[in-house]
Amino acid sequence: MQGGAVITKTSATKHLILRLGNTKDSQGGYDGYQNIVIDGGTWDYNYQCVADKDAPGGFVGFCIGHARNVTIKNATFLNNLKSHFLEFGGVKNARITGCTFSGYYKNYVGGGQECIQIDCCTDETNVFPQYRPYDGTTCEDFVVDGNVFSDVFSGVGTHSMMSGETYKRITVTNNTFHNIKKSLHRIYEL
């Protein structure tokens, strides 16, 4: 994105900012979407504009599934409502570097949603129902490096797993965490 570009959510609904591709017709595995780069910009999820922010549920900012070679760098993500800034399910070879994640709905006491959520492609218990097929594809070869997490509930992680499937080669290094309300990182079944 051009230097100084700002994208601000203005809808009063709890919808995503960015969903990669068609959620019903993916190739499955890691072959759905490839070679994606998001470089720079400020993405303001603007929870302040949501009409029913005290009602159950929030909204994920970016949702990316069944993909490979995804890079998100040098971007700023602001003002999330009770969910993840970035959510990945079944993604191989992802890099999130040089980003800032800041601001989370302050009145939400049930927090714990990670800024960067690493998931598997399943509809079990509503873990990652956004991308079919539900083939159990996990995330592999993830690098989360040189980011800043400030005034949020949790930095990086997952709170789901599938029997017999594991997340592989997840690297979280050189990040800075300020005023984290719950956990810096949490990943199951590495």
PLM regions: where:
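Parallel beta-helix/beta-solenoid
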Residues: 2, 12, 33, 38, ...
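Acidic glycine-/aspartate-rich tracts in secreted/extracellular proteins
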Residues: 4-5, 43
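Extracellular beta-strand-rich solenoid/capping regions of secreted or surface-exposed proteins
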Residues: 6-39, 48-68, 87-89
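Short glycine/acidic-rich loop motifs that flank beta-strands on beta-rich extracellular proteins
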Residues: 8-15, 47-53, 60, 81-88, ...
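Short, recurring structural edge motifs at helix starts
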Residues: 21-27, 126-134, 159-162
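Conserved donor-binding loop and adjoining core beta-sheet/short helix segment
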Residues: 22, 119-121
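Generic short beta-strand segments
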Residues: 41-47, 78
